[in-house]
Amino acid sequence: FRSLGAVYQNFKYLAMLLSIGKDSTILFWLARKAFFGHCPIPLVHIDTTYKIPAMIEYRDRVAKEWGLNLVVGKNQKALDEGMNHEKGRLVCCEALKTQGLQCIMEEHGYTGLILGIRRDEEGTRAKERYFSPRDKNFEWNFKDQPPELWDQYKTSFAEDTHIRIHPILHWTELNV
């Protein structure tokens, strides 16, 4: 996978996830380099309310100073119903992150998401592809993945899918 510029040209409704962690920050830096100091791709931050205030202040300050299109999503309903980490990591992440992202995608019509994940982070991510389809329920069939050989990628998918694009998938912790 070589070019964020090509991805930007080929996906009509594209956004980039920004968790404010090291990987998404590197990805944002790469996007700014690809677009000569500007990032034309909307940045989506899913606010779980668990980030330290200094991170949120940094996010807001950078977005304002650099004129970024920052979209902040939050599953307020789940938070109002008492969702928190004490209910279990998987349950909490599903409610606050996944459902929060689903709401933002529906609201803004995004069909492509750029993420800063790496294969070496976790077992399931080792099965990811640079262009990874999800169905309308955000389900991913990891058993039915097309090969990605010699920089040839499948980039067209069924109508009801959105595509997750992973530019730094091949990076390691040391690369970051």
Per-range role (PLM):
Residues F1-V176:
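Nucleotide-activated chemistry modules centered on ATP-dependent adenylation/adenylyltransferase
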